[in-house]
Amino acid sequence: GQKVSLYNQHVNAKHPLNGYRLKNTSALHLMQGPITLFDNGTYAGDARIEDLPPGQDRLISYALDLKTEVEPTFDGGTQELSTVSLKKGTMLISRRAVEDRAYLVKNRDTKAKTILIEHPYRADWKLAEPKQSTERTRDLYRFSLAVDPGKSATLRVKETLPIQESILLSEGGIDQIAYYQQTKEVSPK
């Protein structure tokens, strides 16, 4: 297995949880239930695992990681204009909503850490930066971030949402055409 710190803003806004990726390397089916975790022979916490078939792994979280701090920031949403076109008396406008989030991770420990940052997955939104996540569950992206001892690192997550709008030109769309013709975001094509 692998020791990690697991950050989810909705679980604890400031600190990640200590975690461990447990892999069942036996030929036996491990039944669900409570387990006790030790770190270098010292009690680290208790956790509960779900059924674990042979060859599969589970992420277990068991205690707050007080030596690591995460500061999430949201730079707000913006809209970018993609295209404006005319077709059969209708103006078609394509925009893209953009959301930019950053996670500043401070490792105050004397050991390097791998932080798994959980970020909400929304089906309509497309991941723009980074291009893909380390893993994805039904409701979450998970991004892996390595942080050296006594250092900080930042993960930036940028997502886009396509928005389509159509305006019938007989509804006073001439003013709209003039507006989009003057904007610097649209190419003359």
Please give the residue ranges for each predicted region.
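Intrinsically disordered, low-complexity Ser/Thr/Pro/Gly-rich interaction regions
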Residues: 1-104, 111-124, 128-129, 133-145, ...
